[in-house]
A protein has these predicted regions:
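Boundary at the C-terminal end of the N-terminal hydrophobic targeting segment
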Residues: 47-49
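Active-site cradle of extracellular carbohydrate-active enzymes
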Residues: 195, 205-208, 212-216, 223-272
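Oxyanion-binding "anion nests"
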Residues: 264-279, 284, 288, 294-296
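N-terminal secretory signal peptides that target proteins for export/translocation
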Residues: 1-25
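Short coil/turn linking the two alpha-helices of tandem helical-hairpin repeats
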Residues: 106, 160, 216-220, 276, ...
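Extended ligand-binding groove/face enriched in aromatic
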Residues: 115-218, 225-226
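Bacterial N-terminal signal peptides
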Residues: 32-41
């Protein structure tokens, strides 16, 4: 479907504060535009009453504590890519996923220590910051990846809502401006992968839809209305295949890599969820449901991915949780819960202890367990 040509202000108001509160309480990670609307429109989210955590939530809390113990270097103030005394510092991509995991846990517990962890990780982003106020891929001067910056921008909006800290909105806005600067106007659109890299992947463009739509809830200026719509239209005209799923990237020579990867579907589910909340149009929920249903057909059987793919799957599963929270029954969370059970058993096995001792994989487990674990 097309992006909206104008915002439906009355429809936004019809998305009641009660429904947004239900979504806030039910959705532990990457909260979508509803989190921003809650803080901006109806005040701070209420403190959570003491309650028993689900098994998945408790596993997420425990796994996050273990992640800190295994990977955090308190002297450097950074996480290491693997557990061990002489491992290198993690790059921005895994660090962004650790921040998303920390936000997920703090959203569950609201414990002072968990909120402090979120603040600490945000402060550590200063190691990656560029003179322009966006982020290098590594702690040394390196390329600026548009997709990595997308994840950080979404994390910052989630943290702004969670911590009631409006100072985090400015760097998120700078990231969105950076995305616009990466738009390839000469070759028909799409955001580049990185500085000087001509590939245009789905994950450089699609998360920018959600980022821009969420920012529009706070600042309805033209760029936050025009550019998400442009990104959305490009994704659906250039990157959507006949199955209704989204291909991976356009190469430097204009050829399309038609690989199907889980998180490319997840970011477009989230984009439609964001538009559904922002506009009140049911058609976006239906589009998100179609993507989820097509993904279930294209990715049959157990999900058993590792490394980067575990993080890709986490992004997809979290998007399903967002869709389910906004529209109960809209999608089937059983495969995601089966995935958590499999990872739980894997982590307990001596041969594969601690999910292969990879920071990115641990962060992925925390996010998935927090979002869908039973």
């Amino acid at each position: 479907m097309d992006a909206p040509k104008e915002w439906e202000g009355d429809n936004v108001r019809r998305t009641t504060s009660a429904s947004l509160l239900r979504w806030w309480r039910a959705t532990p990670v990457r909260l979508g535009v509803a989190a921003v609307l809650l803080v901006a429109a109806i005040g701070a989210a209420p403190a959570h009453a003491a309650r028993r955590l689900s098994d998945g939530q408790q596993e997420a809390v425990t796994a996050m504590a273990r992640l800190d113990a295994d990977f955090y270097d308190s002297q450097e103030g950074l996480y290491k890519v693997r557990g061990g005394a002489h491992e290198p510092e993690a790059a921005l991509w895994p660090t962004s996923q650790v921040l998303a995991a920390a936000i997920a846990v703090a959203k569950i517990t609201h414990a002072p220590a968990d909120l402090a962890r979120v603040r600490r990780i945000i402060a550590s982003l200063s190691h990656f910051v560029t003179p322009e106020g966006v982020y290098h891929a590594r702690v040394i001067r390196s390329l600026r990846y548009y997709d990595d910056n997308n994840w950080v921008g979404l994390d910052l909006l989630d943290a702004a809502a969670l911590l009631h800290d409006s100072s985090l909105l400015a760097p998120a806005k700078r990231i969105f401006s950076f995305l616009i600067s990466g738009w390839d106007a000469k070759q028909g659109g799409g955001v580049f992968w990185a500085d000087g890299h001509p590939d245009r992947p789905t994950v450089s463009t699609a998360p920018g839809i959600t980022l821009g739509v969420r920012l529009s809830a706070l600042d309805p200026s033209g760029s936050y209305r025009e550019w998400p719509a442009r990104f959305y239209a490009w994704m659906n005209s250039r990157m959507r295949g006949p199955q209704g799923l989204y291909w991976d990237h356009i190469q430097y020579d204009g050829q399309i890599d038609k690989d199907l990867v889980s998180y490319n579907q997840g970011v477009m589910i989230d984009a439609n969820v964001a538009y559904a909340v922002r506009t009140g149009q049911r058609a976006y929920i239906e589009q998100a449901r179609r993507i989820a249903a097509a993904t279930a057909i294209a990715f049959p059987g157990p999900w058993r991915n590792r490394g980067n793919y575990a993080a890709f799957d986490a992004i997809y599963f979290v998007s399903l949780a967002h869709l389910s929270a906004l529209s109960p029954g809209a999608t089937n969370l059983a495969p995601a819960r089966d995935y958590v059970r499999w990872e739980r058993a894997t982590a307990a096995a001596p041969r594969l202890a601690r999910l292969e001792n990879e920071l990115l994989e641990q962060a992925a487990f925390v996010q998935t367990a927090a979002a869908v674990g039973d």
